[in-house]
Amino acid sequence: MHISEGILSPAVLAGGAALATVGVAIGLKKLDYEAIPRVAILSAAFFVASLIHVPVGPVGAHLVLNGLMGLLLGWTAFPAILVALFLQALLFQFGGLTGLGVNTVTMAAPAVICFYTYRCFLRTRGLLASVAAFACGVTGILLSGLLVAAALITTGQAFIVAVELVLLAHIPIMIMEGIITLFIFLFLKKVRPEVLEDIYR
């Protein structure tokens, strides 16, 4: 869901950079030594998943995995996503360096929101936890789409048509991400339940 370089206004870019700085600072403060491998693995997964993208106007449609990252990382999703986006901008010119802050916020902020919204349900057993895991994947993409839409509309009314295309293009991705998040949640619950217990204690 990268916003291409040269699209957003300076005010939106500055605001995104400021919010990203705050989010990354909080994420680094909450990052403990034991969580570093988990953060690194999910950052790498995000990097690979979002490389396969389809251009939709000024935005690329692709898997984001931010619902999953929110489920497993919380605030540390901010530095994880920032590192992946920085490498993509540097190596492949995806999103560009000037839009790094906005792109980080549009993908990491929903991850944090998902973490706090669903963690009380993810602690439970049975169907409710599974529904929450699926909803976490869907919500991450939905909120990212809305934030991208807000950034584009704030920049100019000319992007309204592009906003509609972006939101429509991400509907199937929402379902895919919900299924992926649910599958990984159930896998961890069965194979490594202590990981989830440590996150949601």
Model segments located where?
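Short helix-perturbing small/polar motifs within transmembrane alpha-helices
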Residues: 103-148
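Hydrophobic alpha-helical transmembrane segments
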Residues: 11-14, 36-41, 78-82, 100-105, ...
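Hydrophobic cores of alpha-helical transmembrane segments in multi-pass inner/ER membrane proteins
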Residues: 14-20, 108-117, 175-187
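Small-polar-interrupted transmembrane alpha-helices in polytopic inner-membrane proteins
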Residues: 43-47, 77-90
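Alpha-helix C-terminal capping segments
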Residues: 69-76
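Hydrophobic transmembrane alpha-helices
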Residues: 1-68
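C-terminal transmembrane helix-loop-helix hairpin of multi-pass membrane proteins
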Residues: 131-142, 149, 155, 159-201
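Interfacial aromatic-anchored transmembrane helix boundaries in multi-pass membrane proteins
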Residues: 51-59, 83-114
